[in-house]
């Protein structure tokens, strides 16, 4: 009986998490101005921090700093 109750609570929590996530992505999709500012990025010059994401650099190579 207790196991059933725990499983039911777990399913309800997971369902609530999925609904919250779906609602957030729908909110971003409905606001074009917010979506465009999130997708638009300036590129970093040589020597600036980029982590390991080459999309942040104006060039194509990135290893913690733009090359």
UniProtKB/Swiss-Prot annotation:
Residues 1-24 form the signal peptide. GO terms for cellular component: extracellular region. It is found in: Secreted. Expressed by the venom duct. GO terms for molecular function: ion channel inhibitor activity; toxin activity. Its main location: secreted. Residues 25-39 form a propeptide. Belongs to the conotoxin O1 superfamily. The presence of a 'disulfide through disulfide knot' structurally defines this protein as a knottin. The cysteine framework is VI/VII (C-C-CC-C-C). This is Conotoxin Cl6.7. It comes from Californiconus californicus.
């Amino acid at each position: 009986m207790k196991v059933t109750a725990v499983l039911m609570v777990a399913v309800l929590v997971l369902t609530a998490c999925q609904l919250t996530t779906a609602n957030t992505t729908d909110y971003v999709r409905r606001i074009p101005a917010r979506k465009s500012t999130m997708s638009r990025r300036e590129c970093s010059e040589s020597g600036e921090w980029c982590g390991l994401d080459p999309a942040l650099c104006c060039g194509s190579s990135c290893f913690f700093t733009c090359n």
